Amino acid sequence: MLQKLRKRQRELEEKQYPDELYGFEAEIYEFFMLVAGSLDYVLANKRIPRHQRRSLEKSFFELYPDILPDMIKNDKDLYHHILLYEQVRQEICVALSN
C-alpha cells in the first residue's frame, strides 16, 4: 500500500495545477494541501492530527457544499485534477483504516 501511495505522491507532484479555478481558489488549494499533506504524514509514518483526519474523511464536495459538481464539470482539466486528489484521499483513508 505504501508503495502505491509513494507512486501517487510523485503523480501529484508532477501534475501542474489547472489554469482556471473559477473564484474558489482558496477551497481548491486547501483541499489539495489537505490531501498532499496527509499523504506526507502517512508516508513518513506519522500520526495525522484528529481535525485533519476528520476533514480527510470527507469528499471535496462534502467539505465545500457551496461548490456544486456542475460548476466544474465543464472544465475537464480542473475536474480531473479534483478527481485525482479524491482518489488519493480515498486511498489514504484505506491505508489509515488498516
Curated annotation (Swiss-Prot):
Highest taxon of the source? Bacteria
A Pfam family hit: YxiJ
InterPro entries in the cross-refs = WapI/YxiJ-like
User: What is the protein name given in its UniProt record?
Assistant: Uncharacterized protein YxiJ
Organism source for this protein? Bacillus subtilis (strain 168)
Gene transcribed to yield this protein: yxiJ
